[in-house]
Amino acid sequence: MKELQTVLKNHFEIEFADKKLLETAFTHTSYANEHRLLKISHNERLEFLGDAVLQLLISEYLYKKYPKKPEGDLSKLRAMIVREESLAGFARDCQFDQFIKLGKGEEKSGGRNRDTILGDAFEAFLGALLLDKDVAKVKEFIYQVMIPKVEAGEFEMITDYKTHLQELLQVNGDVAIRYQVISETGPAHDKVFDVEVLVEGKSIGQGQGRSKKLAEQEAAKNAVEKGLDSCI
């Protein structure tokens, strides 16, 4: 565990007072089961605690970061951030995969690279950090490790581009956004609409769809993908 302690100190300025607690956070059930006579604790209870504090802190962040997003969108984004694959990625970023104690069978079967095990260890670490320090230290760690990727948009599943474009453009105040139909083609029962989105009278994106609403979404998507620099 000394190497892990060095990583935590050098990269995150974290020093555990309770070294046994830290070791437990990285002990998988398979390792504990293979050493039953030693009565070694595994990390499942810490995982339970870490999951709870992670949900709380990510929820708080999203609530404050996106004041106009509805509950459903916030829940979807949170689910993307705290899902197994995402947490496993964060664990690898922190080099946690190197320090998990696994049983021999689990090790041979590739457990060290398994997202489930890595994600669980990441949550267990958060639980241990909460017990050894406090929620403020957990928040500091999350903001250092997780939030930069969230703010880079790695977990966004954008379905409402009109709302997303509006949020991007109105960060610093109200901006006049308007959608207008450029053309309509095809028979009445099968029309195709071409729409452009304008900001302060300037066209910043165009889209096409079989309804005005779909075409507007495509126009907004086109504007978002161009980047904000082209919108102002």
From Swiss-Prot:
Detail the disulphide connectivity of this chain as listed in its UniProt entry: none
InterPro entries referenced in this protein's UniProt entry, alphabetically: dsRBD_dom, RNase_III, RNase_III_dom, RNase_III_sf
Where this protein primarily resides, as one coarse class? cytoplasm
Keyword match Lipid metabolism: no
Location comes to:
Cytoplasm
Q: Which Pfam families match?
A: dsrm (PF00035), Ribonucleas_3_3 (PF14622)
Q: Which cofactor does it need?
A: Mg(2+)
Q: Which SMART domains match?
A: DSRM, RIBOc
- Note whether rRNA-binding occurs among the keywords: yes
Q: NCBIfam families under this entry? A: RNaseIII
Protein known as: Ribonuclease 3
| Species of origin | Streptococcus pneumoniae (strain ATCC BAA-255 / R6)
Q: What is the lineage of its organism?
A: Bacteria, Bacillati, Bacillota, Bacilli, Lactobacillales
Q: Which gene encodes it?
A: rnc
